[in-house]
Regions:
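Predominantly the structural core of cysteine protease catalytic domains
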Residues: 207-216, 250-350
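Post-signal peptide N-terminal segment of mature Sec-exported envelope proteins
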Residues: 23-43
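Bacterial signal peptide processing site
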Residues: 15-18
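Active-site signature of cysteine proteases
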Residues: 95, 105-139, 301-306, 312-408
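C-terminal motif of bacterial Sec signal peptides marking the signal peptidase cleavage site
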Residues: 10-13
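Exposed beta-strand-loop-beta-strand "reactive/processing" segments of non-cytosolic proteins
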Residues: 53-103
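Active-site-adjacent structural segments surrounding the nucleophilic cysteine of cysteine proteases
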Residues: 108-276
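Sec-dependent signal peptide recognition
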Residues: 1-4
């Protein structure tokens, strides 16, 4: 089991630099102990997929936290407090596990294999070094925890299921289907306009999350082709779709081919570039592009209840997650996270794990592997019809080919 004494020191150390507002002291039945954190970490790593190693003796390297401005429900005091929402448990030679810091919240909020995050005084630091999708998904986890502690009055029953046979669902997972985590920078942005803004890479604007997500989708739907809208590939698509990261395009022909494909998709869907080096496009137009290219064999629905079922039932079943412009400034301010300003962010969901009855979707963010991982799906804040104080205004498009479509 995880080294207790070292972990206890780290847990207290993560709050040594206290912010100005005092930490709220609430009912002890909501307190998350080190033993609870240990159980949550072990549960998060149970039945790992996608090549994550199975840790027999996971050892914690560091524990950090995110806090939010907080006022207890029905409080008549004017004092503002700080509430710890999430623990970020970094393992030695392992992933970072996001664990709820209050038992009204969920035990597990995420498993991030390659996270490189910095914290201080309960805040996420160096946010300008994180792409918008990464901040978005971390903010989604923190918002979910905040919603739980402010809208519920009893402990979440999933804490009692940690490391129990009843809590395990060995059939509740789907291996990811998209092999790539290319990102939006070099070489995909080779043909983007010149830019010196914060989102530029090597002097070029970002390739854009929507065309990159569409190119990623093609790696699932198309095994090979030699001509892409009149452009003759110098290498085969079969090779390109197996270049798992943007650093794996070593040959000039490969770099040029993938840049042309992503750039042409951007042109076809009317992508525009902003002064800061970011790119803006509409996923709706992207779906029309995909449908045309796949010979009208593409089908999709927008039913949140079908996301995991579509992945299981259909060989090409994946989901594009669309996040519109966020207007919930007060929520992001409370979380201390910079609100993503892009008009639309497109993320690929192509796998999932179920932990104690909760579903964590694998998010391929389109901005590199450090932003990818499993994130807890919370229907109270993800969906566009979610309650306004915590809503993230997300929409899903569950994609499949009409040739392999199965009724659920």
């Amino acid at each position: 089991f995880i080294l207790f004494s070292a972990c206890l020191f780290l847990l207290s150390a993560c709050n040594n630099d206290k912010p100005d507002a005092p930490e709220i002291q609430e009912n002890p039945i909501f307190k998350v102990s080190m033993q609870d954190i240990q159980k949550a970490v072990r549960d998060a790593l149970d039945n790992p997929i996608n090549g994550m190693p199975n840790f027999d003796v996971p050892v914690i390297d560091a524990i950090d936290s995110i806090q939010a401005d907080y006022r207890p429900a029905q409080s008549t005091e004017k004092t503002h407090y700080r509430k710890t929402l999430l623990y970020f448990v970094k393992l030695v030679k392992g992933p970072t596990v996001m664990v709820g810091a209050d038992k009204r919240a969920e035990p597990i909020y995420g498993i991030l294999p390659n996270a490189d995050l910095k914290f201080g005084k309960g805040k996420l630091l160096a946010q300008d070094q994180l792409q918008a999708p990464c901040r978005l998904m971390i903010g989604a986890a923190a918002a979910s925890a905040l919603c739980a502690v402010e809208t519920t009055t009893t402990p979440n029953p999933r804490w009692a299921l940690l490391q129990t046979e009843k809590g395990r669902n060995m059939a509740g997972w789907q291996m990811t289907k998209c092999p790539v985590v290319w990102g939006q920078g070099y070489p995909l942005n080779l043909l983007s306009p010149s830019s010196e803004g914060p989102y530029a890479d090597r002097g070029k604007a970002a390739a854009g999350s929507v065309p990159v997500a569409l190119a990623q989708t093609l790696t699932v739907f198309k095994k090979d082709f030699s001509v892409f809208y009149g452009y003759n590939l110098k290498t085969s698509w079969a090779k390109l779709r197996n270049r798992t990261s943007n650093t794996s395009f070593t040959a000039g022909d490969e770099q040029n081919d993938i840049a042309v494909i992503v750039n042409y998709i951007g042109i076809s869907i009317g992508q525009v570039y902003n002064k800061d080096g970011s790119a803006t496009a509409t996923l709706r137009r992207g779906l029309d592009f995909l449908s045309d290219y796949l010979g009208r064999s593409l089908g999709y629905d927008q039913n949140w209840n079908n996301v995991s079922r579509n992945m299981k039932a259909n060989s090409h079943g994946i989901t594009l997650l669309s996040v519109g412009e966020q207007n919930n400034d007060a929520l992001w301010k409370r979380l201390g996270i910079e609100r993503p300003k892009s008009s639309e962010i497109c993320l690929l969901l192509d796998g999932f794990e179920q932990k104690n009855g909760a579903t964590l979707f694998y998010v391929n963010s389109g901005c590199g592997e450090k932003a990818n991982g499993y994130y807890l799906y919370d229907d109270k804040i993800w969906q566009e019809v979610a309650r306004s104080p915590y809503s993230l205004n997300m929409k899903v498009y569950n994609l499949y080919t009409t040739t392999d479509y199965d009724e659920f």
